[in-house]
Amino acid sequence: MKLSFLSLAFAVIFVMAIMYAPQVEAKASADADADADAAASADALAKASAGMLDRILGAVKGFMGS
């Protein structure tokens, strides 16, 4: 059976997303600054996700040869 390039690309993206996934640790916070901590955590997560997506897309472009 022939494997299409689209499914191969999805498989590569899936594997790279697992490889580059950051290790995270959850912590509970019950103090008054919990909302500020949550906003800072959300900003840090957004920046990390954008960087991870850039690396994955760069790797896929390199793999596809474009």
From Swiss-Prot:
Taxonomic lineage: Eukaryota, Metazoa, Ecdysozoa, Arthropoda, Hexapoda
Residues spanning the signal sequence: 1-26
A GO-annotated cellular component: extracellular region
Organism, as annotated: Tetramorium bicarinatum (Tramp ant)
Keyword Methyltransferase carried by entry: no
Expressing tissues: Expressed by the venom gland.
Molecular function in Gene Ontology: toxin activity
Major location (coarse): secreted
Keyword Signal attached: yes
Protein name: U8-myrmicitoxin-Tb1a
Pfam family, one: Pilosulin
